Curated annotation (Swiss-Prot):
Function recorded in the entry: Possesses two activities: a DNA synthesis (polymerase) and an exonucleolytic activity that degrades single-stranded DNA in the 3'- to 5'-direction. Has a template-primer preference which is characteristic of a replicative DNA polymerase.
Protein name listed in UniProt: DNA polymerase II large subunit
Chain intervals for the UniProt region annotation (Disordered): 284-303
Record's keyword terms, sorted: DNA replication, DNA-binding, DNA-directed DNA polymerase, Exonuclease, Hydrolase, Multifunctional enzyme, Nuclease, Nucleotidyltransferase, Transferase
Keyword Nuclease: yes
Catalytic activity, EC: 2.7.7.7, 3.1.11.1
Superkingdom to which the source organism belongs: Archaea
GO molecular function annotation: DNA binding; DNA-directed DNA polymerase activity; single-stranded DNA 3'-5' DNA exonuclease activity
Subunit (UniProt): Heterodimer of a large subunit and a small subunit.
InterPro entries per record: PolC_DP2, PolC_DP2_cat_dom, PolC_DP2_central_dom, PolC_DP2_N
Gene Ontology biological process terms from the UniProt entry: DNA catabolic process; DNA-templated DNA replication
The encoding gene: polC
Gene source species: Methanococcoides burtonii (strain DSM 6242 / NBRC 107633 / OCM 468 / ACE-M)
């Protein structure tokens, strides 16, 4: 394996991590060698690089060495294709048949294309088979499953190209579809679009073109309950149900990613794919939609309202598309943004009623679809009008808390910080930059190269200094005094100039301008001042503006308030201002970005539903709560023995003494084997398939076990008392051989208040936010401890002596929430208990306080992947997020647009994870650490991380080019990107950022969405905020919530009520119709409805109220009225009532 290029300091860091990892593996192997687990060793193989990950994930021996050899001379994609052909030709690995070799070839190629991280190669590809064409030739079919989605569109499409490349190598012909098969594809994809979702839906012509020309048969296993109506029972298609995997690969893979496939086809000179040219000319990727249009010869960014679709009640809209008052784009990267995370002022988070907290996802207009939110207090906050009429900008948290109850209207919600790299990643044209300080300072330096600059002073100059600099250096007006002139028109500008000229009163020293309040309001000029974001105060009957001289000069007035112009000669107001003012005024906020709330941030323990402490099956013996204590005392009837329970469990046999049982180890000390039999023939067979009928064999059956004895022995063996508040198991094991977990582990988990996941590990989920730099003070760790962890110098090379110094975060170090830290602390205590009481070895952590767990090793894992990443805990945050280096998130194949992942204690994974517990179903191996990446190689992480910019400032040419909506690729060579540092020591070190933030956890601790109670309360808060924000149209929000959330919900619940099944409260048996006896025929329990009247009607009254209050369209009102009638007719008692004489009087 080629050595990763890193400095001595970074190599020492990696060696420290790997040394601790080796120590923990040795401890676990020693503990597991005592025979108390399904395997006597650690079950998570280690991988130092992509080649190792692919080999461990797919299980084809010798692949790793071949990958390393191929990557020396080829690109990743070319190497994947070559690798597939080598495997298919039998040069690597051993296979029983040609179809098996082709299947393995496709799997290893897809694994390589997805960095050996995602589960798609093992879960998303069901199998490959060889079929017959009508002319007698053979063709290859690839059967895809739902989890292929996690591979991404490009890898999905490339898997088909791999299949073609491989089948040529082994001499198999192309697929020749029948006419009815082509029509079946068309019907099926259109049906899949209705029942699920597709990022891109190809037209019928495009589907026909792909199926008729694709050399591989794209098949799949059935994933949806819906069946096709026409083109059924086809000979070469096994099912009439919808095949989701096939639809994804054809639509989101081949159709959407055709240009990328064509590039590889041309590079590799593969014939037979010429039809891609025809497909590309007819397909327009959703990511390549028209972003800019010509207006008067100038390019312009068009508003996009896609993010506004499917609005959910309780999750507010912060700005309609590109509307004045919405988020103002500011280019730059803070130490906690980039990689799809954006920064906003923490003061803005508070002023907007706490709906946004660190980690909250926002659906955004551009450059991508969504962004995780991070607090950045070095950018501008919201500008608000208070109840007393004052207009001020709130930039600090203290101000926000003090004034938020007085806010009458949010005129402007502030800036949003988005880095250049996110525009490059999304291939989004560079929207015009606002005129900001980092642009102005470069123009200042260019005009005065010999002048010493004091940035702190120049950031907040006085009005006199700002005007003097304009005149002396001939540079544009400072951003502090540049107002939003592009938000008003020529007539408003003229009226404002006239008002100030006639009625304004300027203090002698020019420090204040006073205007008559009532006249300013009556003429509409107060609103114009608000639109311009001119801050002012109301003092008695006067409106007072501080430091008014730049405003006065921008209006073409002198210091006597005399107007020096009569008319405006240009249509564009800024052109007129630049002519009249005598200095240049640049656009202050040319780009607004619309946004609404997506998912709230998350920091919570991972629980299955319901949450068990132990993976031990007890069927119905534990009742609805799955209580293991209840199961230990369960009686089938009054005469039966307590605790003898019938469960479905795996039968195992000891190869040494022949004793049968269900445990993985026999009393004689030998490990047991599954006792396989054919469920159809009933014969014992020691093979995966029955030789008689070819059915899959199994070892599971219903049997009675003495659970009470197991339960008591478990408590006794670890010296614990049976006094647990709650102790839960599972009804049934989902694993292949249904081998239960030792009950002792569950007892100790319950003791420490922990819950197990499907693989025997304890997890904690957190929203992903990037972090490249830290201050020891903000993560709750002393300088001394940071030095022990290897943080010796700050980003300027100075020795670490102060907890406020900024340090470059090492790539595998994590900062987790305090709540997560408490949970991890309990896990360390559980592991120590387990080592001492169950394995009878020495404790490892001895942690009593969260300070004791700083430096412990963790493992990060994303839900759609099967590869864990080694990490180290170095600090804590009050925010409900998990902060980690972008490389760490990218290694899990995640970005930070609102995704959430889990961390687990490394020792817990090593000690308790077992493949024997994983569910034996599609997707069962996803979200399981089947391999562990020990060292992060930036060249092998998700390529999105390569587009992150690491510079301290953006060049002047960048800001200027954005005014012409430049292509982001034009600056790839200019910007300091990760991609330009790969293969050098700088790929790990000397990162910088353009905007600092004083505290990465500033802002609300939790989103209001999580703290508000009912959905009605959330909805009320959402609409109140909509009324408060100038950039939001509250009636439109109300209409959208009704049509996309409440109405579909009510219709769905009404339909569900009429089709519902009934349920027994005692044994949970379900019935299609209520039993005639009114009680459960199985246990005699009470039978109840599963959908109740309250659930159907819960949104009706609130919908009627919203429709009236916000005057929604008459069509929506009528829909609400009609569904009200439906509910009334369904639930109202139709019995005739006795009427008296008085009823007619």
């Amino acid at each position: 394996m080629a050595e990763i290029v890193a400095s001595d300091e970074m190599n020492e860091y990696f060696n420290t991590l790997e040394g601790t990892l080796k120590k923990e593996i040795d401890i676990v192997n020693d503990a597991r060698s005592r025979g108390k687990d399904p395997k006597p060793h650690v079950e998570i193989p280690l991988a130092k690089d992509l080649a190792d990950r692919v080999e461990n994930l797919i299980g084809v021996k010798g692949v790793a060495e071949l990958i390393r050899k191929l990557e020396e001379t080829m690109s990743r994609e070319e190497a994947a294709l070559a690798l597939g052909r080598e495997v298919a030709q039998g040069k690597v690995g051993e296979f029983d048949s040609k179809s098996e070799a082709i299947e393995a070839a496709i799997r290893v190629s897809v694994a390589m294309l997805t960095e050996g991280v995602v589960a798609a190669p093992i879960e998303g590809i069901d199998r490959a088979s060889i079929g017959k064409n009508d002319d007698g030739s053979e063709y290859v079919s690839i059967f895809y499953a739902g989890p292929i989605r996690s591979a991404g569109g490009t890898a999905q499409a490339l898997s088909v190209l791999v299949g073609d490349y491989v089948r040529r190598g082994v001499g198999i012909d192309r697929y020749k579809p029948r006419k009815e098969e082509v029509e079946r594809y068309i019907e099926e994809i259109m049906l899949y679009k209705r029942v699920a979702s597709l990022q891109y839906t190809p037209s019928e012509e495009e589907i026909r073109l792909i199926v008729e020309n694709c050399p591989i048969c794209i098949d799949g296993e059935p994933t949806e309950a819906e069946e096709v109506e026409g083109h059924r029972n086809l000979e070469r298609i096994d099912t009439n149900r919808v095949r989701g995997g096939m639809a994804l690969v054809l639509a989101e893979g081949l159709a959407l990613k055709a240009p990328k496939i064509q590039k590889h086809v041309k590079n590799l000179k593969i014939d037979g794919w010429e039809w891609l040219e025809q497909l590309i000319s007819g397909v327009k990727s959703s990511s390549e939609s028209d972003e800019d249009e010509e207006t008067d010869g100038k390019p312009k960014i068009k508003p996009k309202d896609k993010y506004m679709r499917d609005l959910i009640a309780g999750r507010p809209v912060f700005s309609h598309p590109s509307r004045p008052g919405g988020f103002r784009l500011r280019y730059g990267r803070s130490r906690n943004t980039s990689f799809a995370a954006a920064g906003i002022s923490p003061a803005g988070m508070i002023v907007m009623d706490d709906f946004i907290a660190p980690g909250t996802q926002l659906k955004v207009e551009r450059p991508g679809k969504a962004a995780g939110m991070a607090p950045v207090d070095s950018i501008e906050g919201p500008t608000v009008r208070l109840n007393n009429g004052d207009v001020i900008r709130i930039d600090t948290i203290d101000e926000a808390y003090a004034l938020r109850s007085e806010v009458e209207e949010i005129i402007d919600i502030g800036e949003i910080l988005i880095n250049y790299g996110d525009f490059l990643e999304n291939n989004h044209p560079l929207a015009p930059s606002p005129y900001c300080f980092e642009w102005w300072i470069q123009e200042y330096r260019k005009a005065a190269p010999d002048t010493e600059t004091n940035e702190a002073e120049l950031k907040e100059p006085t009005q006199e200094v700002a005007l003097d600099l304009c005149k002396e250096l001939n540079i544009p007006l400072h951003p502090k005094f540049t107002y939003l002139w592009h938000d008003i028109d020529n007539s408003q500008y003229t009226a404002l100039a006239d008002l100030i000229s006639k009625d304004g009163l300027l203090e002698a020293d020019g420090s204040f301008l006073k205007l008559p309040l009532q006249r300013t309001i009556d003429t509409g000029m107060k609103k114009v001042l608000e639109d311009l974001l001119v801050q002012h105060k109301i003092q008695g009957q006067a409106l007072t503006i501080e430091e008014p001289l730049p405003l006065i000069h921008s209006l073409g007035l002198d210091e006597e308030l005399s107007k020096g112009w009569d008319s405006l000669g240009h249509e564009e107001l800024l052109e007129n201002i630049n002519e009249i003012a005598g200095f240049v005024v640049r656009p202050r906020a040319p780009t607004r970005i619309g946004a609404r709330m997506g998912r709230p941030e998350k920091s919570d323990k991972r629980k299955m539903t319901p949450a068990p402490h132990a993976l031990f099956p007890i069927a119905e013996a534990g009742g609805n709560t799955r209580s293991l204590e209840k199961a230990a005392n369960f009686k089938v009837n009054t005469n039966s023995k307590a605790g003898t329970i019938p469960v479905e469990i795996g039968n195992r046999i000891c190869p040494a003494c022949g004793v049968e049982g269900f445990e993985f180890r026999c009393e004689c000390g030998e490990y047991t084997l599954p006792k396989l039999f054919c469920p159809r023939c009933g014969i014992s067979v020691n093979k995966e398939k029955c030789p008689k009928c070819n059915s899959k064999t199994t070892c599971t059956s219903m049997r009675k076990i003495d659970f009470k004895s197991i339960y008591q022995k478990a408590f006794e063996s670890i010296g614990e008392r049976d006094h647990l508040d709650s102790f839960k198991g599972v009804k049934k094991m989902m694993s292949k051989h249904m081998t239960p977990e030792p009950l002792e582990k569950g007892i100790l988990r319950a003791k420490h208040g922990l819950f197990t996941f499907k693989d025997g590990t304890v997890r904690y989920d957190m929203s992903d936010i990037p972090l490249t730099h830290i201050r020891p003070a903000e993560i709750g760790v002393s300088c001394e401890r940071m030095i022990e962890l290897g943080y010796l110098k700050d980003i300027y090379g100075k020795p670490l002596i102060d907890s406020e110094q900024v340090l470059c975060l090492k790539v595998q170090d994590l900062v987790i929430s305090y709540d997560a830290a408490d949970y991890i602390l309990r896990i360390t205590q559980y592991i120590d208990d387990l080592l001492v009481k169950y394995y009878k070895v020495a404790p490892y952590y001895n942690a009593k306080h969260i300070d004791d767990i700083v430096g412990v090793l963790l493992m990060g894992l994303a839900p759609h992947t099967s590869a864990g990443v080694l990490g180290r805990l170095i600090g804590f945050t009050t925010a409900s997020v998990g902060y980690a280096h972008p490389y760490f998130h990218a290694a899990k194949r995640r970005n930070c647009d609102g995704d959430e992942d889990c961390v687990m204690l490394l020792m817990d994974g090593l000690l308790n994870f077992s493949r024997d517990y994983l569910p034996d179903k599609r997707g069962g191996q996803m979200d399981a650490p089947l391999v562990l990446t020990t060292r992060l190689d930036p060249s092998e992480v998700d390529k999105e991380a390569h587009n992150i910019d690491m510079c301290a400032s953006y060049p002047l040419e960048f800001y200027e080019a954005t005014q012409n909506i430049a292509n982001p690729k034009d600056f790839e060579g200019t910007m300091d990107l990760v991609s330009g540092r790969l293969g050098t020591t700088l790929q790990y070190e000397e990162f910088m950022f353009t905007h600092d933030t004083s505290n990465i956890a500033a802002g609300p601790l939790k989103s209001a969405y999580k703290t508000l109670g009912t959905m009605v309360e959330k909805m009320d808060a959402q609409l109140e905020l909509a009324k408060k924000i100038r950039a939001v149209d509250a009636p439109d929000v109300a209409e959208r919530v009704l049509t996309s959330h409440f109405l579909p919900d009510m219709f769905g619940n009404l339909r569900a009520f009429s089709r519902q099944r009934t349920r027994c409260v005692k044994c949970a048996a379900k019935f299609r119709r209520p039993p005639l006896t009114g009680s459960c025929p199985k246990c005699g329990g009470r039978v109840i409805l599963t959908v109740h009247e309250g659930a159907v009607k819960k949104y009706l009254q609130v919908s009627i109220k919203i429709a009236e209050e916000y005057n929604v369209s008459s069509y929506t009102k009528q829909r609400i009225e009609l569904i009200g009638y439906d509910m009334k007719s369904l639930f109202e008692n139709d019995k005739s009532k006795q009427m008296g004489l008085s009823d007619f009087m």
